[in-house]
Amino acid sequence: MRRTLLCGDTLHALMSVYTTVTRAQLTEWLKNYSLGDLQHMQGILSGIENTNYFVTTSRGKYVLTLFEHMGVAELPYYAQLMAHLAARGFACPTPVANCHGQFIGELNGKPALLVTCLPGESVVHVSPAQCGQVGTVLAQLHHAGQGFTQRMLNPRGPHWWKSYLQLLRSKVAPAELRLIESEIHFQAQHAHADLPHGVIHGDLFRDNILFERVDNTGGVNDLPGNISSKHGRIGGVIDFYFAGDDALLLDVAVTANDWCLRPDATLDVEQLAALLRGYRPDNKYSNAEKSAWPILLRAAALRTWLGRLGYNYFPLQGEMTFTKDAGLYQRLLQQHIDAPAHIDTLI
């Protein structure tokens, strides 16, 4: 099963559009760009934090994002990061500057950014081979980000956990609160200063990697179809708006907690091993990384659980919205506590 994210195709699924943009409004806004005439616009599936539209003009296909929470001051980091990665050959959206040379504009009272549209679609049910590709592309992202000089503290790191807990304190059940507080206390004892640090994506879930399909002739295309016997290739990585600086292995843990997650809140061992091998083909993880791995899996589960609790308790009002299961990541965190996963048993 795949969740369609193809540029310009019709979507028959739940969507999230918090700020509605009319065709007339977008046409007027695009006069600030040298992109030709507007041909088509459409709300995009799966956005939770922001409003997204596919935009097709006479000169190409793009994605328009209206930022519902972020201020203008925060956004140049993300635009410059994507520009940096794209310039180094990494497959990610390229920000489009307006006629004044600016990436960030304003539309309907919200900061807005236009980026190029990548080929492919996100997957829901994944294979070990795809997990291996995900590990490889994550390693490529970390390598491409090495020369990026701007700095941004991980926006979903420990400082955020603590502040967000205060918002949730009156909402969550006592047992949930105890688990969150206990885990935050546990994580505070592990700074991971001895691990490699750099730019992390921070949110490399299944809906943020696009796979191109392999057609019946063996060629690659991005049209819907059955590729159960062929896995396709990654067309690109999207949604960098949780990026920041942190331990690189934390990014692997966040990714593993989604790509290898089973419905029973355990990680698929075969998929996890494939992801770890894809990320580091020589399997040479340092002793510090091996020791940190089960701790980082817990940190990653906590981060996602808190985020999903927030989406459910404090939903944005939108034209088309949906929520995600927070309890799954509570159970995953408890699983990581009760049965820690160790790299040595996987590679």
What are these regions (language model features)?
Residues 57-149:
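ATP-binding pocket architecture of kinase catalytic cores
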Residues 19-32, 149-153, 161-202, 206, ...:
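An alpha-helical support segment within catalytic cores of ATP-dependent transferases
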Residues 31-38, 88-91, 192-193, 283-287:
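Short secondary-structure junctions
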Residues 45-57, 63-64, 95-96, 185-250:
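Active-site acidic catalytic loop and adjacent metal/ATP-binding pocket
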Residues 167, 304-347:
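ATP/Mg2+ or Mg2+-diphosphate-binding catalytic cores
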Residues 285-297:
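All-alpha amphipathic helical-bundle segments outside canonical DNA-binding/catalytic cores
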Residues 2-42, 327-347:
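Regulatory N- and C-terminal appendages and interdomain linkers associated
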Residues 249-284, 299-316:
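Active-site activation/catalytic loop segments of kinase-like enzymes and analogous catalytic loops
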